[in-house]
Structure formats: structure tokens, C-alpha cells
């Protein structure tokens, strides 16, 4: 882990308008950033939009890292915002399985053969509009 200041470009996001309490930060280093971002926008964003609120989710997004660059560091950050720790745990435990329509189309296994580099849970203490 490298300490310091990180700069990201927000590529896309969803916001339900409801304040979340916890956010899952997914750090990724896909084999192709452009394809990863495009799949998130065209496949995953509609899925999250359709299901927003059903599982306690209040937000979703994706960003690409601008700087700093380290050879083994993540280059993409995605986030999922939830209303409670209970709903975070249910989500991470796979209690809301993916529909086959998504599972059959995703290329995540090819774009990230080793999965996410890190998955972190952060508590939201405050925010501004």
C-alpha cells in the first residue's frame, strides 16, 4: 500500500438521492481499463439502477486512477453504497445472486482473472451536496 494523495476521474455513477451509511470500495487492475469501464457503463450500471433500493443500495460508481501510478497498484475504483452494514454483508455474502442474463454477458473473468485487488468497507461519517 502506498500512502499519499490519489487522483481519480469519475467515469460514471448512480445516486438514489438517499444518504448511504456504508460504501464498499472495490480496487481493480483489469487487463484492459477501457473495456472494463465500458462493461460497467453498459452492463452493470443498468443492473444496479434497476435494483437500486431493493437490497438497501443507495449508490454505485466507477472511476479511473489518474495519479499516482505504481506498477502493481489498482487502476480502477468502483463503489457500492448501502443503507446499513447488514445490507453490505448480505451483498458481499452473495444473497442477491446475479441474473443469468448478466452472468452470461460479463467479461469480468477475462478482464480481472484474479478478481479485485482489494475490497474495503468504509463508514460514511458525513457528506455535502
Task: Give residue ranges: language-model regions.
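Short S/T/G/P-rich N-terminal loop/turn motif that feeds into the first structured element of a domain
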Residues: 1-129
Amino acid at each position: 500500500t502506498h500512502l499519499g494523495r490519489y487522483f481519480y476521474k469519475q467515469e460514471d455513477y448512480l445516486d438514489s438521492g438517499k444518504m448511504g451509511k456504508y460504501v464498499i470500495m472495490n480496487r481493480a487492475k483489469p487487463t484492459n481499463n477501457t473495456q472494463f469501464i465500458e462493461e460497467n457503463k453498459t452492463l452493470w450500471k443498468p443492473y444496479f439502477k434497476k435494483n437500486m433500493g431493493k437490497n438497501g443500495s443507495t449508490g454505485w460508481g466507477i472511476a479511473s486512477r489518474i495519479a499516482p501510478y505504481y506498477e502493481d497498484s489498482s487502476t480502477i475504483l468502483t463503489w457500492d453504497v448501502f443503507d446499513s452494514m447488514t445490507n453490505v454483508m448480505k451483498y458481499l455474502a452473495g444473497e442477491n445472486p446475479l441474473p443469468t442474463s448478466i452472468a452470461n454477458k460479463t467479461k469480468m473473468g477475462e478482464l480481472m482473472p484474479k478478481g479485485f485487488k482489494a475490497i474495503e468497507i468504509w463508514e460514511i461519517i458525513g457528506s455535502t451536496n
